[in-house]
Each structure stands twice: as structure tokens, then as C-alpha cells.
């Protein structure tokens, strides 16, 4: 084995190790909580992935799955988007002094262009921003928010009918 061959094999080993680490990080995707109620109440037109500004005890609670997105919504303050009314339970193994407020307002981390677009959609078009799901992406906790239009009662009934028809078609095709 000559010098160049040895150098080439070690370089390839380093590249493959880096590639394996990248593949392992991308493979981790774990849904922690989902807002199924939002899909029933709103017609979701577009979804956006956002980061959340969290405290340490909130991260622990979310990883345990003790988060409720059902009543949550987003609002604008001082050019920022805040996540309001999302309940993250206090962590069990921490004393009350170090724990967080379960319903505190949390800042969403988005690019300025996305914030401007969302603000335009909510103010001009009368749409609502709703949290849809919260999940782990690698080691980061991410939130999927949706731009939605509220459904009326007849829209909900029509969606139920369409769902029933699809279900009947699937059962008929299985036979």
C-alpha cells in the first residue's frame, strides 16, 4: 500500500461517517401532538413549518407528549407572531419555582417574508392561523401552522358526507 492509497481510504471513511450522521439526523421525525379538531373546523389552505421559542421545562414536557393544541391560535404583536392559548403542562420532576406558566405566549420563529405574508392573509383576506401539529425534526421541536378559513355548519356536513362516500367506495372495492 502506498501513501496515496492510504490517504484516499481514510478520506473516504471520513466522508462516509459524515454522510451517515447526516442521514441519521434527517431520519428522526416524531409527531408529538396533532390538532385534529382544526381540520374539522377550518379549511386549511396552506401549511408552514415554524420554530418555537421555548423554555427548558417546556421542551421536557413537549417531549413527554403533554401538549394540547386544540384551542391554540396565532396573533401578531410588534412584527412578531405569537402562539396563544396552547397548553403545555408543567414538568412533573421540577419544583414550582423553576416551572413555566402552562398558557404563556410563545414566539414563533419565521422569516420576515413569511410573517408579512401571514399578516396580509389574516388582515386582508380574513383568514386564521392555526397550529396543526408539533413534532421533533432531528433535535429541534417544530410546529406546523396552517392558514385556514373557518367552515360553516353546512360545509362541515358536506365534508362528513364526502368522507362517508369515500369510506363506502373503499369498502366496496375491497369486496
Curated annotation (Swiss-Prot):
Gene3D superfamilies xref list: 2.40.280.10
* GO BP annotation list: trans-translation
Task: Output the superkingdom of the source species.
Answer: Bacteria
Keywords associated with the record: Cytoplasm, RNA-binding
Q: Which GO terms describe its molecular function?
A: RNA binding
Tell me the InterPro entries matching this sequence.
SmpB (IPR023620), SsrA-bd_prot (IPR000037), SsrA-bd_prot_CS (IPR020081)
Alphabetized Pfam families for the sequence:
SmpB
Tell where it localizes: Cytoplasm
The answer to whether UniProt assigns keyword Cytoplasm to this entry is yes
Where is it mainly found? cytoplasm
**Membrane-spanning segments:** none
A single GO CC term, please?
Answer: cytosol
By sequence similarity, the record places it as follows: Belongs to the SmpB family.
Q: Which HAMAP family does this chain map to?
A: SmpB (MF_00023)
Q: What does this protein do?
A: Required for rescue of stalled ribosomes mediated by trans-translation. Binds to transfer-messenger RNA (tmRNA), required for stable association of tmRNA with ribosomes. tmRNA and SmpB together mimic tRNA shape, replacing the anticodon stem-loop with SmpB. tmRNA is encoded by the ssrA gene; the 2 termini fold to resemble tRNA(Ala) and it encodes a 'tag peptide', a short internal open reading frame. During trans-translation Ala-aminoacylated tmRNA acts like a tRNA, entering the A-site of stalled ribosomes, displacing the stalled mRNA.
Protein name as annotated: SsrA-binding protein
Amino acid at each position: 500500500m502506498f501513501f496515496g492509497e492510504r490517504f484516499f481510504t481514510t478520506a473516504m471513511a471520513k466522508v462516509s461517517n459524515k454522510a451517515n450522521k447526516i442521514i441519521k439526523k434527517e431520519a428522526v421525525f416524531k409527531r408529538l401532538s396533532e390538532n385534529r379538531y382544526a381540520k374539522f373546523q377550518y379549511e386549511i389552505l396552506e401549511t408552514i413549518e415554524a420554530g418555537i421559542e421555548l423554555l427548558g421545562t417546556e421542551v421536557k414536557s413537549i417531549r413527554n407528549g403533554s401538549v394540547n393544541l386544540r384551542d391554540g391560535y396565532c396573533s401578531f404583536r410588534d412584527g412578531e407572531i405569537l402562539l396563544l392559548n396552547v397548553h403545555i403542562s408543567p414538568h412533573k420532576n421540577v419544583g414550582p419555582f423553576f416551572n413555566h406558566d402552562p398558557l404563556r405566549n410563545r414566539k414563533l420563529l419565521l422569516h420576515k417574508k413569511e410573517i408579512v405574508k401571514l399578516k396580509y392573509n389574516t388582515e386582508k383576506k380574513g383568514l386564521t392561523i392555526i397550529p396543526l401539529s408539533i413534532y421533533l425534526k432531528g433535535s429541534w421541536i417544530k410546529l406546523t401552522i396552517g392558514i385556514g378559513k373557518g367552515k360553516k355548519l353546512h360545509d362541515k356536513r358536506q365534508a362528513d358526507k364526502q368522507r362517508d362516500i369515500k369510506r363506502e367506495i373503499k369498502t366496496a372495492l375491497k369486496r
